[in-house]
Amino acid sequence: TGGGLAWGGGCSPSLTPELVMFTDNADPVKLLALDMKTGEIVASLPVLDDLPEGYQVAVENSAIVYDDSEGTVSTIVCNWFGAGNAGLADPNNDSSIQSYANIYDQNWLMKGNCMIAPGVERVDTIKTDSGYEMKSIWSRNDLSDTSILKLSTATGYIYGYVQDLESGMWQYIILDFATGETVFTMDVSNKYGYNNMAIGMYAGNSGNALYCPTGYLE
């Protein structure tokens, strides 16, 4: 798509006992399921392909993958287009040479997630008698998240760190894994420095705490 941080796909592969899951960088971007033993593509599906006109897609993080051990593998794919400016659209630009200044550019730092294209989608890969098939379960075209979403199978919730674009408020957000609906938000701050700048959120070892690094000191 020419809008990511490199010409290839940026989605690190995630593994199940039978499959390797990742997205490509085609147009449209597709989720791929490869056979773990042979490398054969056993299923694929365009993802994040129903965004409003003008938005592009680049997946630059590892997708959430959950295997329920009953024949269904659920994958959560998140759009990162706009998270940094690698200049891939410029034919004279050498995309192999990057710097702090263009990956963490000032527009993104100051303006926040209005610079990030929206899109979060859940796709299920289902094992059938004849192989595998993929289907979209839900999609959210109103969320921009670069915190590397976290899934808790104990609660059935997906946890993230987003910005309300109307108020500028940075928030922790909880989504229902089954439906994709927002079930809870908690305000953090509307100061620009609370932008996580694609630094991944993580959970504490107690299982009851979430942490998302930002660039703000106070």
Identify the function of each model-found stretch.
Residues E18-D24, V29, N61-K191:
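Loop/turn-rich, solvent-exposed surfaces of beta-rich toroidal or solenoidal domains
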Residues A6-S12, P52-Y66, D142-L151, Y192-A203:
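Repeated scaffold domains used in trafficking and secretory/extracellular systems
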